Design a protein with these regions (language model features):
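Long, amphipathic alpha-helical coiled-coil segments characteristic
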Residues: 13-60, 67, 89-111
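Intrinsically disordered or compositionally simple regulatory linkers and C-terminal tails
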Residues: 1-10, 114
Length: 114
């Protein structure tokens, strides 16, 4: 089941969802966004090699993305899980990479603000 799309002004990160999740604590928002950047980079790097635990890695990324409001990333990670099981993850992995890159750019922009 796809997650709700982010509001247009939020781009790849649903900032309202993030604010609700962090109870409006701006410092916590920045902290979880930074943690997501590190985790997403590590998981996407691992997924590129398609290790035996790739489906679990995609599921972990889906949950983390959902928590911060990166619903496109969550959707793409969710689509990767069955693609891995079906033995043809190439397209799904490329779409996940693109969604993560978009979220990363948005997060870096958010974190660059004072």
């Amino acid at each position: 089941m796809p997650f709700p799309p982010p509001a247009a002004e939020d781009g790849p990160i649903d900032l309202e969802h993030l604010r609700r999740t962090t109870l409006g604590d701006a410092g916590l928002e920045r902290e979880v966004l930074g943690m997501f950047l590190m985790q997403a980079g590590r998981l996407v790097g691992a997924l590129a090699a398609m290790p035996p635990e790739a489906s679990a890695l995609a599921h972990t990324l889906k949950g983390s993305a959902c928590a911060i409001g990166a619903f496109r990333v969550a959707d793409r990670a969710g689509e990767l899980e069955p693609a891995i099981r079906d033995g043809d993850p190439t397209q799904a992995l490329a779409e996940l990479d693109a969604a993560v890159a978009e979220a990363r750019a948005a997060i870096e922009h958010i974190l660059s603000r004072p």
